[in-house]
């Protein structure tokens, strides 16, 4: 009897250990019995929270599923716009398992790679439909005036052709992401049992051949704008230069006029002073004028004067009183 007790205890201990299982933090567990997901009395999949749980050994199999939000970084794919032009969009999806039983069955045993492949197909189909209904300009830009120009943009920046076109575009990039999130969330929950938490377009590129064409157009536009600004600058410079020259000519004319008036007034005042002086003492005035004439006449050593000694020019040399020589 004792010999049988030991094997029985070992088997009982083994069965007890096999009936215990632990669900780690951040995961959830479901129990599969005879190939079917174990459900409660309400026909709802029984979810095992993190912690220690029991199962029927040999009959039950525990499948642990990640309950955290997961990120599916999709590959960049090519889409066609309403203009029949190609764009390359790189996006990502954040998702988590909501219905663990449905997820387990839809993915063939809870395979996350299968889940992401199915989810990526759904996202791509919806995104392809959204892109096909819009033009490139609507896809690459956000809401109108959202990220086109800053609030303190100068008038020159607003007046460029590219800026005017951008302001006229009602960008729908955010609307596209919102629509994809809404439509994908509904179908993903229904078919896969997962909840799409977020969808974002990381990068929107153009194929090389289209990019080169757009770059050439942008370069031509910029060169045209630069030429326009240079032409306007030269025109403004000519206007400023002409205005400056006009102001200089006006100032010089006014200065010359003022100088002439001042000179005339000074000459008149000098003549008046001379006249008054002459009236007060004509003899002295005549003497002073003769002295100035002598100084001016004899200032140069090379000058030769041939004069009659009895001429009026020498009247003060011949007579201190200025009497004329006879």
UniProtKB/Swiss-Prot annotation:
It comes from the Bacteria. The keyword Kinase does not apply. Its main location: membrane. The keyword Membrane applies. Gene3D superfamilies: Band 7 domain. Keywords: Membrane, Transmembrane, Transmembrane helix. It is a single-pass membrane protein. GO terms for cellular component: membrane. The chain crosses the membrane at residues 4-24. It is found in: Membrane. Coiled coil: none annotated. HflC and HflK may interact to form a multimeric complex. Belongs to the band 7/mec-2 family. HflC subfamily. HflC and HflK could regulate a protease. This is Protein HflC. It comes from Vibrio parahaemolyticus serotype O3:K6 (strain RIMD 2210633).
